[in-house]
């Protein structure tokens, strides 16, 4: 571990992560104008947030800091790539990791690996979909747009909340905390379409005040000690590419998983590539649509 990394990472093992995140959630709901307006102005300057992209550019119009952080953008701020059978990025950020999965093993950083089984909360059967598949990790910093959108047309299958730690998910922590994405609190969201299945995972982090989806509402910060599961197969919840599906407060990470051969370009994106929601990530490989994923979810 690098000298400076030691002082950035080790304290995270010692602090009350969930208590601090609940405190951040409370602070982000403060409505006193002089507090929330000055906080927004300060952080806009520190993180160089482009307020001109916002649907509402007037800081005073946001009821609290959370409303600003999850602000809507102007309709033309994030055009959705129209390429047929292509995935667009579900979020703003950088591609912090893009890889072909080796069996069930994913590389987090040099000397650090984690397994599909662990990432997916111990769901060994579901993990079989993604053996030798492709994966991309998008890191959202505090300056980024914090709404999550559909990468492609699909039907919602199910969702699982997995409790866990709340380490930061910045590059320093990724380098030094083993199995970070498989140990942090997360939402595992399963989708299916005519191409088969895919998975989008929202990973929590320290000071991420809450995670929420449009179909289930706010999931955190009410920490749950056990895995929670929701099945939507009977609800017929279908979404189009570019539809909003969830939100983060502050910054965090989205992990995408695709089965082997379905989205080969997903695992070949250059590391640290900046990306905006709506820009193309990769395209589905051409194949006979009558041949469906043999591990189609049940």
From Swiss-Prot:
Family annotation (InterPro entries): PS_Dcarbxylase, PSD-B, PSD_type1_pro
Top-level taxon in the UniProt lineage: Bacteria
EC number, as in UniProt: 4.1.1.65
Residues of the site described as Cleavage (non-hydrolytic): 251-252
Top class in the EC scheme: lyase
Keywords of this entry: Cell membrane, Decarboxylase, Lipid biosynthesis, Lipid metabolism, Lyase, Membrane, Phospholipid biosynthesis, Phospholipid metabolism, Pyruvate, Zymogen
Cofactor note: Binds 1 pyruvoyl group covalently per subunit.
Localization annotation: Cell membrane
Catalytic reaction annotation: a 1,2-diacyl-sn-glycero-3-phospho-L-serine + H(+) = a 1,2-diacyl-sn-glycero-3-phosphoethanolamine + CO2
Gene Ontology biological-process annotations: phosphatidylethanolamine biosynthetic process
Membrane topology summary: Peripheral membrane protein
GO MF annotation: an example: phosphatidylserine decarboxylase activity
An example Gene Ontology CC term for this record: plasma membrane
Active-site feature positions: 92, 149, 252
Post-translational modifications: Is synthesized initially as an inactive proenzyme. Formation of the active enzyme involves a self-maturation process in which the active site pyruvoyl group is generated from an internal serine residue via an autocatalytic post-translational modification. Two non-identical subunits are generated from the proenzyme in this reaction, and the pyruvate is formed at the N-terminus of the alpha chain, which is derived from the carboxyl end of the proenzyme.
Pathway assignment: Phospholipid metabolism; phosphatidylethanolamine biosynthesis; phosphatidylethanolamine from CDP-diacylglycerol: step 2/2
Signal peptide span: none
Lipid biosynthesis is among the record's keywords: yes
PTM annotation (Pyruvic acid (Ser)): residues: 252
NCBIfam families: PS_decarb (TIGR00163)
Annotated function: Catalyzes the formation of phosphatidylethanolamine (PtdEtn) from phosphatidylserine (PtdSer).
HAMAP family: PS_decarb_PSD_B_type1
Similarity comment: family membership: Belongs to the phosphatidylserine decarboxylase family. PSD-B subfamily. Prokaryotic type I sub-subfamily.
Name of this chain's protein: Phosphatidylserine decarboxylase proenzyme
Source organism per UniProt: Hydrogenovibrio crunogenus (strain DSM 25203 / XCL-2) (Thiomicrospira crunogena)
């Amino acid at each position: 571990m690098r000298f400076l990394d030691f002082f950035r990472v080790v304290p995270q093992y010692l602090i009350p992560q969930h208590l601090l995140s609940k405190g951040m959630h409370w602070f982000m709901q403060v409505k006193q104008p002089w507090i929330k307006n000055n906080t927004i102005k300060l952080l806009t300057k520190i993180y160089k947030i482009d307020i001109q992209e916002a649907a509402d550019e007037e800081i005073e119009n946001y009821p609290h800091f959370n409303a600003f952080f999850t602000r809507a953008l102007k309709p033309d701020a994030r055009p959705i790539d129209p390429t047929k059978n292509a995935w667009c990025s579900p979020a703003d950020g950088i591609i912090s990791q893009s890889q072909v999965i080796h069996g069930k093993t994913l590389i987090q950083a040099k000397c650090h690996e984690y397994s599909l089984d662990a990432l997916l909360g111990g769901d060994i059967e579901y993990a079989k979909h993604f053996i030798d598949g492709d994966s991309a990790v998008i890191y959202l910093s505090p300056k980024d747009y914090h709404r999550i959108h559909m990468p492609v047309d699909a039907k919602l299958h199910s969702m699982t909340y997995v409790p866990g730690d709340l380490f930061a998910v910045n590059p320093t922590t990724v380098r030094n905390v083993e199995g970070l994405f498989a140990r942090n609190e997360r939402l595992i969201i399963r989708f299916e379409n005519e191409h088969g299945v895919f998975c989008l995972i929202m990973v929590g982090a320290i000071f991420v005040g809450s995670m929420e989806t449009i179909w289930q509402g706010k999931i955190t910060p009410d920490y749950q000690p056990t895995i929670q599961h929701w099945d939507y197969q009977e609800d017929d919840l279908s979404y189009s590419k570019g539809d909003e599906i969830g939100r983060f407060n502050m910054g965090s990470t989205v992990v995408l998983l695709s089965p082997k051969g379905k989205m080969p370009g997903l695992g070949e994106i250059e590391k640290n590539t900046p990306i905006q929601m709506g820009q193309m990530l990769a395209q589905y490989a051409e194949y006979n649509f009558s041949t469906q994923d043999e591990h189609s979810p049940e």
